[in-house]
Amino acid sequence: PATRFDLTGKVALVTGGSRGLGREMCLAFAGAGAAVAVASRKLDACTALAEELKASTGVRAAGFASNVGRWGDCDRLVEDVYDAFGTVDVLVNNAGSSPHYPSLAEVSEELFDKVIGLNLKGPFRLAALIGTRMAAGDGGSIINISSVGAVAPVPDALPYSAAKAGLNTLTVGLALAFAPKVRVNAIMPGRFLTDISQGWDPAVLGEAERRIPLQRFGQPPEIVGATLYLASDASSYTTGSVIKVDGGLAPGNG
């Protein structure tokens, strides 16, 4: 029943929440009744979305500035969100980045560390802090947003793919660490048409679409089904899982 997806009375924290897939998740959580903490590096964008959520659904919502690639920022974000909302029932580690580079030999140490920091180190720290509180309290759900690059890496995004593969492994380990009260799962999105994709070459887009079994890129709202499933009681017996939402792009089952 639909009530299995109800999040009334819950608090969800979404990193990278002000745009793209993160924004869609925030909208979905608010629509399901959850209070929403929107976090990203840009406070203005987070606050604007929080105000939109409050106006459209009546839920509590607030924006938080945080660069989750930095350990100290993660610590401050956790304290600020718990101070504002009292708890976190759903953590979505969505913030990520895959900067372009001209060649593998030209990947700088700074770029490599930044990619690992944002896509792997930050999610670990947030999950460690919040998962510990969840396990000591009323439980909760942690959702790591990975990528099909974790299982189908490409040469022009290797640091990103390696970080996301690590995030998949982290998901399984965290599920063991925080069981039985906390469920930890991951979603591997394929290629979605977000604001980031607007600058892509149309010819390249067309060729890429033809390699996807469903013959198209995903629309941002299509991430919502898996997200609500994992956040809610609908997935009460699901933990340590990695779910592809990719139109069939990646091989196998992750």
Task: State where each predicted segment sits.
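Active-site helix of classical SDR
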Residues: 127, 163, 171
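Substrate-binding pocket helix/loop in short-chain dehydrogenase/reductase
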Residues: 74, 102-104, 108-116, 197, ...
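Residue(s) in the substrate-gating loop at a strand-loop-helix junction
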Residues: 147
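Catalytic Tyr-X3-Lys loop
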Residues: 105-124, 143, 167
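Short C-terminal tail/terminal secondary-structure segment
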Residues: 1-4, 98-101, 152, 227-228, ...
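Alpha-helical segment proximal to the catalytic Tyr-Lys
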Residues: 132, 175-180, 236
